[in-house]
Amino acid sequence: MKTFFRTVLFGSLMAVCANSYALSESEAEDMADLTAVFVFLKNDCGYQNLPNGQIRRALVFFAQQNQWDLSNYDTFDMKALGEDSYRDLSGIGIPVAKKCKALARDSLSLLAYVK
């Protein structure tokens, strides 16, 4: 869990320092990881009422904040990447309640920016 958030933070810092280029594979994986977090919150943590449109806006906001160019987004199999990320997240060996609390604390605030 810490590794995921460190990776996202590191990716964010690197993106701030770099020019905007087409979405890289690691950036697509970061997008898939964040998508998996929101899907996990909806499916496993009782946040079924999170609007899909708001989640999409949060993902775009996340990419924009990192100065990522989404023009080649469709070249990645985001469904497969997201499913892999969701499986990885589901397989983390900590109690679901603790996992839900940490994910909600660290990611739901992103939705407030795009509300």
Swiss-Prot record:
The keyword Signal is assigned to this record: yes
Pfam families xref list: T2SS_PulS_OutS (PF09691)
InterPro entries (alphabetical): Chap_lipoprot_PulS/OutS-like, PulS/OutS-like_sf
Keywords in alphabetical order: Signal
Residues in the signal sequence: 1-20
Protein name in the entry: Uncharacterized protein YacC
Naturally occurring in which organism (per UniProt): Escherichia coli (strain K12)
Gene field: yacC
